[in-house]
Amino acid sequence: MQTVLDGKSLITAAMLAGTLPRGKLEHHGEAFETARAELALILHATQQQIEQDKTPAEIVGRLLSFLNGLHSKVHPDVWHALIPVAQNHPILKYFLEDPLTHWSFTKPRGYSGDAQLLDYIYCDPHVAESVANASEIGKALYSHTQNVPSCVAARERRDLLTRYVDEIAVKNGPQTEILAIAAGHLREANRSVALTEGRLKRWVALDQDPQSVGLIARDFQGTAVEAIDGSVRTVLTRGHKLGKFDFIYASGLYDYLAHNVAVKLTKTCLQMLKPNGTFLFANYAEGTPDAGYRETFMDWVLLLRSEVDMWNIVNASVDRNTVEARVFFGENRNVLYAVIEKRG
């Protein structure tokens, strides 16, 4: 089933690239040639390591480190031009043996960062068979890639969402209503005590991928979870009469949204909160050390943000006199969170 994209929700790297400011590469001619030469050396050295049968962990660990070094020092326009150079190198085939890298690069659902990719990152039982069927090299690579800092941060993010839901349910009682936007497979619900004990009125899971919506409906049948097919546009246009909520969150979505769309979505979500309700959004942070590998060999480009960027979204969306707001890093500083609590 081909997923229909609306340009405002989960999107492909090419679509995301259209939202990013890009200069002309000719302005960086010499810098590009220097960077391309450095990348060629990195790729050649990696190929030699593969031919010498070095361990997959050593090979991918070294590549991650060198790509991060290059990514962090070149201009974004130069880096963007280097991505296809890396992707067209013969060593790509080796790294595609890793089920996580393979799923991300080939995009079976037609877009980046889909829910099954997150299942690989979560080491979820739903992908255990796929991992078991990988080659020995693939399994060894996966043992490393699943534990890069951004993946560790994604698992922490999942567990943080569960804690927020359970704490808000304790505070508000059995009438608690939750909304997850771009819910994916809603894995954070698997460990929710409030859901298991029937202490939620409803947990609405909105996603634009029909496969994800179907899986949620199947896995959480008979619970307070309601799976709904819808996108950012659905929320912005109030396409569904969703009602009001105690807690709304968008944990893996803002990484794909330009500032103006992020502000519109934040404003809309705040209008959908009950008095004293809470809105949370998360975003991968600038400086994530695996961005170089992710953007090349995983073909997964994210809009990384700083603390200032997060505050800019918050401040453009609210009257700070009417809310309590905070921005904070996760434990390994790879993910940023913004939490806005509505006063009264």
Language-model segments: residues:
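Conserved beta-strand/loop positions that form the S-adenosyl-L-methionine
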Residues: I181
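A short beta-strand submotif of the Rossmann-like class I SAM-dependent methyltransferase core
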Residues: A250-L253
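A short acidic, Gly/Pro-enriched loop at the edge of an enzyme's catalytic core
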Residues: T237-I248
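Helix-to-beta-strand junctions that scaffold the AdoMet/dcAdoMet cofactor pocket
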Residues: L257-A258, L273-P275
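Class I SAM-dependent methyltransferase Rossmann-like catalytic core
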Residues: P84-G173
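Class I (Rossmann-like) S-adenosyl-L-methionine-dependent methyltransferase catalytic domain
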Residues: Q2-D77, V85-H89, H144-I168, N172-T176, ...
